[in-house]
Structures are given as C-alpha cells and as structure tokens.
Amino acid sequence: MREESWEDHDTIQLTAQRKYLAEVQALETLLTRELSVFLTEPGSKKTNIINRITGKTYALPSTELLRLYEHLEQCRKQGALMYFLERQGTYSGLMLDYDLKLNTNAAPPLEPPALSRLCHRIFVHIKNSSVLPEGSHKIHFFFTLKPEVVQGKYGFHVLIPGLKLAASTKKSIIGSLQHDATVQKILHEQGVANPESCLDPHSASVPSLLYGSSKLNHKPYQLKTGFELVFDSSDPDYIPIHQIKNIESYNLVSELSLTNEQGSLVRPVYCAADIAAEKEEEIPTEDHSLSILMLHDPEARYLHKILNLLPPEYYVEYPLWSNVVFALANTSANYRPLAEWFSQKCPEKWNTGGKEKLEQLWNDASRHTEKKITKRSIMYWAHKHAPQQYKEIVEQGYFSILAEYVYSYNGMLEHYMIAKVIYAMMGNKFVVDVDSNGKYVWFEFVLPGQPMNQGEIWKWRKEVNPDELHIYISENFSRVMDRITEHIKYHLSQPHETNILNYYKKLLKAFERSKSKIFNDSFKKGVIRQAEFLFRQRSFIQTLDTNPHLLGVGNGVLSIETIPAKLINHFHEHPIHQYTHICYVPFNPENPWTKLLLNALQDIIPELDARLWIMFYLSTAIFRGLKEALMLLWLGGGCNGKTFLMRLVAMVLGDHYASKLNISLLTSYRETAEKPNSAFMRLKGRGYGYFEETNKSEVLNTSRLKEMVNPGDVTARELNQKQESFQMTATMVAASNYNFIIDTTDHGTWRRLRHYRSKVKFCHNPDPNNSYEKKEDPRFIHEYIMDPNCQNAFFSILVYFWEKLQKEYNGQIKKVFCPTIESETEAYRKSQDTLHRFITERIVESPSAETVYNLSEVVTAYAEWYNANINVKRHIALELSQELENSVLEKYLQWSPNKTRILKGCRILHKFETLQPGESYIGVSTAGTLLNTPICEPKNKWWEWSPNPSAPPEKEASAPTP
C-alpha cells in the first residue's frame, strides 16, 4: 500500500475521526454550541485561543479554558489530530524552541541526566533576568520532542508553564541563553551541529501550540519527561531537582499550558519584570491564513505542492515571479496567502520591498485581465522542470479529494463528488460555457498524441459530448478508487480498537458498492451533468479568438503581433478555437513550391507595383482586427488567374477565417431590420471575404457597400437566431468578368474602392508575340490548389508580405505606392461617376486664381458640360449641390460671409482651354494608355522590392522555375 503523505493523512484523518471518535464529536459540539459566544475578531488583543482548523479565535475565561483543556486531553489520548494554539499574554509561562541540525540522521538521546543539566542552566538565567518572589516555590520543566528526524533536522521544546514572566523578561532570558557555553556544550554532546544558533529568538511571544496539537502537515511533539525544581529564597544556592513521577496521570494539555493558572501539578509563580509592564510590546497573533486555506481548500494544498517544484528562478527573477503571482491572482482571489508564501522563498527580495511589490502586482492582476495567466501555466512550468515529481503530486491530489468524500459520507459517492474529483483531474483540459442558445457547451484543449482533425492541436476544440471524460471516468478514475480501497484495507490491518475496525469494515463495504457505478452509463451521464457546473468558465465563449493577432494554424498558433511572426507550438493560455489546417513554415524563396507560386503571381499580375500592392492587400487577410476601409474590385475577362488566386487565399485561411460571399449581398436591396441575413453573417470574425463571377452590368448597392467596407460595428442575425453586433474585419475582393455599376458620386464611397484590370490571359496556344498571353497549366486549378505543400508555401508568402507591410509601411496599405492601381481606379471612377469626370477634366487647382465661384455656378457649369458631352437631361440644382459637397471638391469648398458655399483656389476650364503655369488637374493623372504601361521589374527578386515613388525599379529576371 502506498502511504499517503502526512499532509494527506491530516486531512483524511480529520474527516474520519469525526465519524468514529465520540471525543472529537463532543469537542466540536462544545466549540460550535457553547464557546461560540466567546469568539473574537482576528487580531483582537483579547484572543487567548486559536483554532487553526477553522481559523476562529476565542477569548475564553478560565472556567471555559478548563473545559476546553479537558476535551482536548480526551481527544489527545485517543490519538485525534488537533490544531489549537494559545496566545501568550502579558504574563505567561516560558517556552524555549530549539531547532536542531544534527551531525547524523539519528535522533539525539536527550536522556534525563542531560536534560536535568539543561534545567539548571536555564534556571540560572531565569534568576539573573527576573525577580523571583520570596519564599519556597516549585518550578516545573517539561521537555517535548519532535517525533522523528527529517533530513538531518530535529527539535525539542522546553516548557516552564508555571513561571509567569513578562515578554521582555523572556527575551532577556533567551538572549542570554543563546550565548551560554555550558548549554552549547550539552547540546554538542548530544550530536547537535548548530548549538550556537538553534534557540529560536521569537519563541518569547509567538502563539504556542497546546500539548497534543501540531502544525498542519506535522506530527505533534511528544512529552519526553518533566522535572520539578525547588527554589527557596532563604537558601538560593540549594536548588534540588527531581524527575516527575506518574506524569501521564495529569491532564497534560492543562498542565503544559503557558497561560493556565489552575493546574493540579503546576502552580503559578509570578515574577517581577525588569522592564515596566507599560513598556511591553504587543504580543502578536500569528498569521495562519495559509494553513487555514490549505486545510479547507484541496486545490490550494495541491497548488502549494506544485509551486514547490518550481526552480529558484521563479521566485528570484522578477518576470518569472510576476507571472506566478498573476497566475495565482487570476485563478482565485483567495490565493493571496500562497503568493505571499511563494514570494518569501527569496528572503532577500521579500525583505527589500517584496511585500509592497506583491501588493501592487496582485492589484494589477485584478485590473489588467488581458494578461490571463492562470494555474494552468503553473502546472505547465512544474511539469516542465520536474515531470516525475509533478506526476506523483498530481496523483496524490486526486486521492486526497476523493478520500475526503469517502470518509465524510461513509463510502457513499454521488454524481457531484465524482465530478469534483474529475474537475481536479481534468480542470486544466476542459472548459464549459453557456452558448447564445442557453446550452452548456464543452471545450477540450487538444494536446499532442490525441485523436484530432488537422489543425486542432494546441487549441480549444468544441465537443458535442465530452467522450474523453466518459472514457476517463471508467478507465483512469477507477485506479484512483483502487487506491482508496488499499487505504481502507491498510487501516483494517492495523491494531485498532474494535469500534474503529468496525467503522472501516462498513466504510469498505459501502465504498465497494460506489465503485461499480463508474461503469454505469446513466451514472456517468449524471457525473457529466454535475461537472458542467464545476467546469463552467463564464464568458469563455466570448473570449475565444478575440485577439486579432493570433491565428490558429495546423501546427499550433501563429502570433503576428511581433515581427517576425512567432509560432506557438507548445502549451499556452490563449483562448483559440478557430484554425486553418495549413501548417506555418517560415517564408523560403528557395522552396520549390514557393518559387512556383512567386512565378505564378508574376504571370497573373504583370505590373510590379500592382502585384506588390495586391499581395500586401491580401496579406491583411491573416489579421482579423479593424483595417483600412478598402475593397478591391478586380476586372478580368476570364482565364487570367484571378479566381485561382482568390480561391487559394480562401483555401489557405480555411472556413474559420475566410468566406466566399454571395454577390447578391452587394447587389440586392438591404433586408429590413427584423429579417435574417445569413450571407452577411458569413463575415463575422472573418479576415477575408471574396465575390466572384457576376452577371453582366451588376449594380452595386452603395449603402451596403459602405457598411461592409467601413470599419466598425454592424448588426445582423442568422435564421432563427438573435440579432448580433460584430465588427467588420474582412479584407474583401470582388471579381467579375464585367465592370460593376456604381451609381454614386459620393467621394466617401469611391475613396474606399480600388480597381484593377487583368491584362494577362492563359491560353492553350499563346501568341509568342503577345507578352500578355501565357501558357496555361491546368495543374494550378486541379492539383496545386489542393496540394498541402502548395497551400503551406502560399501561406508563408502571405505572412512574408504581412511582415513586410508592417516593417516598411507601418501596416498601412494606403502608404504603398502603386501608380497602376491608382490610375486604373481613377479611370474606372470616371467611367461610372460623371460628376467626378467633369471635376477632373474641367476643374483645376489654381492657387493664384482670383475668381471665386458660387456653388450654383459650378452646378450650372456641370449641367452644361453634361448636356453637351453625355446626354441632355433636366438637372436638380439642390441634388447637384449636395453631390458636389460630397465629391473630391469637398476640401476646396468654403463658407462665404453670407453663409453660402463657394469654390476657392480652383478654376473652371472652358472647352479646349489649357492649364496655366502653376495649375494642376484635380485627381490622379491618367496620361497614357494603361495597356501600354511598361512591365518593369527590379533587378532583385520582385518580392523584395519596396514601392517608392522616388526610386523606379530596374529590369529584373523572373524567379527560376522549380
């Protein structure tokens, strides 16, 4: 049978003894029903008794103290565990605490002759440090010893309960004893390695354990012997001493109490202090918050053990220490004592402002929830540094929790009890939250070695039913229950009294019935239902995938928050659920698949500036935060590669991050507020959306267009779902064989659009004299786009361009110089927006112009130009005025003194009139034909070039074919 640790023994035994020891039951009744009227506030000066089990403190009068001592003595004789302390008052007995380091692992003999010599030396210092009263007095010395040597350490207490001394006198006695050569010699003879420093200087005032009680996780000290010393002031040189006989016949809890004044053997002897009582310092009340926490919170005991596995750098180095503090604070506000204990493992830092730093960190953790490190990280660190010890502690922790239930409820286990242990076992791996439909939903953190779909590793996987927990209950949990069986049988094999053996027999019989339930399906379902409440982490679903810089990938989580991007392929606490199946590998232009794709991009988009701009734009699809308000309209007659490229982006990002959108979303009228729009909901949380293959002359709904492009919140709902609000985060591309019709003059809409027209066509038999005809390769559509190697390579290209955009353009697409797309966008706008065409052809910026035009004059000029060049129609002046105010002329319009709009700093040209010196057209110049724009490549590899208006690229050789 594997023995439980003493810590586990304490908690289990405390539970068991309440069942079979009538003395313990009587003690609890006394405390809860009769002595509760004497309860005090923690830290009260009136406190004289402290119950470490409950943390309660009492101010008991002498009569009630005697009753308590009687109950404690009966419990002690039955071997019950107790944790009671007495607070030393202004005048109380003397306790000397010796903490010994031994030369061997054998306990020192400490036989009566040596202890008698110690009594004499101690009394000499008592005489020298206090004023003993006149007359003859009996002074009793008791020696209690630590039950065993632990790693070369041992200890004993000297109790002189009848001699009532002031705290200052006790300190004086202890101070002089520390330098007593005779005492040091006696201890040295006993095999003590540290006789000069083994006496604890703080024993003069700290609360003292009542006899039979112990610190949590320690065995109580045992009485070795006692001596009676007789002192007569009339003959101070004659001090007889003899060993006390029949010492066990007395109530030892009462007799060894430092504050009791009504003992049968020990009578009080009051000594005058050498320092006035009014100058006495306060007697402290020891802080037992950590002990109480660990006694009542199994998880705290468990964490205490786990923290002990962390190497020194975790409490010495500030970054690691602060992470531990944050993890404890984020796990539970009650774990502050654990944080203090862990911080004190480095005394140098704790004593130089450590407490203040801890206070600040603890408060920061409650305010800054973005640093969501929890106990899961502590578990990971401990397992990393001490895997074998970690495994043993974890297994022991499960055993302790289950054992408490078994002993508390006489072996009968119900659903919640099993669920509680399962939570301790799997609480770091599973989380439950309630979804928008009010249903409990399970999530499992997927680790290597589990059955999984590609991409689920190191992420939170949604489970319809936690099948692993069902299996775990029957297979793994049964092993923990077997340990309980061993534990009970071990006690049955011990020489206990009949009533205790009968208790264990009944316990084993009931427990064996409970064990069989874990193989029952309906019972396990009940356990899972109860586990839902324990595993519940409120708002967990809302926190999933909220960091736009984190992308779930096939081999972990990719962080693009820093440059270069960082692959997280180990334990982490980022709440990531979504993912793409693509594995991230760093960009390598020498990779054959990367070369293939770089060449393909060069063929699809022949203009270098346009190719770079489009790749920068598409790279923003891996970021799911707010972006620049842009949409790319891509025109092409077919067989030009645009569909391949758009689909490849979508396939690489996967359905969680990308979506193909129905073109009706852009062309149809907006639905009414109460109606669902599943197509629009496809954009929620997506980083990329694309439209393709429209009919001829599709008219875009400009209000929907602006809503989709503008950054900010939108609302929509799925069928049979509630209305939701979400942010538009998608990088959007709309491709068509025909130009879209955009019937608006609103500059706010047009400035969000970019237009590119494909020039290249992939043919079966390309014309060798036409540089825009390329040899088609069906493998791109039918094979490469589905090949994981191709997809991985393209994803690395997207990440490369994202990093390049951040480094060189501060992440802003509008800073990327691209004359091709600018001129094509301008030409496209002119073909759609006649008002803009008029402005860019007939109105020029003229800083020296003295003419100021009323807005009505501009309206008239436009109407005349329209009727002469477009079509004769009736124009509504008010509508035209509003359109001009929202056009590219907006920045040139001013308010006149009479509150009318005027055009200033510009000149309206007459037909065939040319520019004057210093004048320039408004808008982008489109001089020259777009088809004749030279294809100009840089000497270096094209993907390395950074568009710069002041440095045109030089001719470059294309990337080599793999």
From Swiss-Prot:
SUPFAM superfamilies reported in the protein's UniProt record: P-loop containing nucleoside triphosphate hydrolases
InterPro entries recorded: AEP_C962R, Helicase_SF3_DNA-vir, P-loop_NTPase, Phage/plasmid_primase_P4_C, PriCT_2, Viral_Helicase-Primase_Cplx
Keywords for this protein: ATP-binding, DNA replication, Helicase, Hydrolase, Late protein, Nucleotide-binding
EC number of this enzyme: 3.6.4.-
Induction / repression: Expressed in the late phase of the viral replicative cycle.
Molecular function, one GO term: ATP binding
UniProt-annotated binding residues for ATP: G636, G637, G638, C639, N640, G641, K642, T643
Major enzyme class: hydrolase
GO annotation (BP), single: DNA replication
Keyword ATP-binding recorded: yes
Taxonomic superkingdom: Viruses
Family: Belongs to the asfivirus helicase C962R family.
Protein name according to UniProt: Putative primase C962R
Organism in which the protein naturally occurs: African swine fever virus (isolate Warthog/Namibia/Wart80/1980) (ASFV)
